[in-house]
A protein has these predicted regions:
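Beta-strand segments within the central parallel beta-sheet cores of soluble alpha/beta enzyme folds
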Residues: 25-34, 61-66, 91-97, 145-152, ...
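Conserved active-site "lid/cap" helical segment
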Residues: 1-36, 40-50, 54, 133-142, ...
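Glycine-rich nucleotide phosphate-binding loop and flanking beta-alpha elements
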Residues: 39, 98-100, 157, 220
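N-terminal extracellular/periplasmic Venus flytrap/periplasmic-binding protein-like
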Residues: 2-11, 22, 145-238, 242-243
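Flexible glycine-/small-residue-enriched beta->alpha junction loops
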Residues: 85, 89-137
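Conserved catalytic cysteine-centered active-site region
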Residues: 3-4, 35-89, 122-129, 194-220
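Active-site-proximal alpha-helical scaffold in enzymes
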Residues: 65-96, 135, 139-166, 227-237
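Short glycine-/acidic-enriched loop or helix-start segments at secondary-structure transitions
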Residues: 42-43, 101-104, 178
């Protein structure tokens, strides 16, 4: 809370460059940033605006990608493709979503033909309903199995924090909450290490009566950003970057 999507993206880009001091910001050849709801503080071509706000020279171009759940992945593969064909040597790819500021579907106006002509089913417009249809199609994916997967995911995440495996990829960011005021966020929003099967079993299924999708076994509504530095092998070796 109390943050902007573009500022979250700026924090990620600046943190990325701080961790790679051998990279001259002026050498960045492109910035591809994904966002699903491209409006408000994550509109205005978020790739270009985040590049400028991050302090990159105005000679560095940027563009935005809208591919919903696969947006940031598409940013990475698009930049990787540009590098593989020789269009770029070094560039930044990432994504941002501030679901606290922009609930899913905010400001959208789906064409009536989608439903009138049965181009898609009505429940295709809501991800939770789509998830219920997946349970219908694959009956072996029971609610108990989904709950157990969710619980194990939470437990593995908690252990990864204890082992220090996640912190190296995080960038501390200022955030504000009604309870604590301004704080520094050092942990992702999603982890709930106290998750139990009993607790998950008691959650409501908001997308269908007696359904299988709950707030505990589905994707969270989070605010966050990510950025990655991509380079050709030759450029990485030239700059002495660690190839991952």
């Amino acid at each position: 809370a109390g943050t902007r999507a573009d500022d979250l993206m700026v924090r990620a880009i600046r943190g990325l460059l701080e961790r790679n001091p051998k990279v001259d910001p002026a050498s960045i050849e492109d910035v591809a940033i994904a966002a699903a709801t491209q409006t408000g503080d994550q509109g205005m071509n978020i790739g270009r605006s985040a590049a400028l706000l991050s302090g990159l020279p105005n000679t560095v171009p940027g563009y935005s990608i809208d591919r919903w759940c696969a947006g940031a992945l598409t940013a990475v593969t698009t930049i990787a493709g540009a590098i593989s064909m020789g269009a770029n040597e070094i560039a930044i790819a990432g994504g941002v979503e501030h679901m606290g500021n922009h609930p899913m579907g905010e400001g959208m106006d789906p064409n009536p033909r989608y439903l009138a002509e049965r181009i898609v089913e009505q429940d295709a417009l809501a991800m939770g309903s789509t998830a219920e249809r997946l349970h219908d199609r694959f009956p072996q994916l029971t609610k108990e199995r989904a709950d157990r997967y969710a619980m194990n995911s939470q437990l593995k995440t908690a252990q990864a924090y204890v082992d220090g495996k996640i912190q190296r990829d995080l960038i501390p960011t200022a955030a504000r909450s009604a309870e604590l005021g301004w704080t520094v966020a050092t942990v992702d929003e999603a982890p709930r290490p106290q998750t139990t099967m009993e607790g998950l079993a008691g959650l409501k299924t908001p997308f269908r009566p007696a359904g299988r999708v709950t707030p505990g076994n589905s994707s969270g509504l989070n605010d966050g950003a990510t950025a990655a530095l991509l380079a050709s092998e030759e450029k990485a070796l030239e700059l002495g970057l660690t190839i991952k």
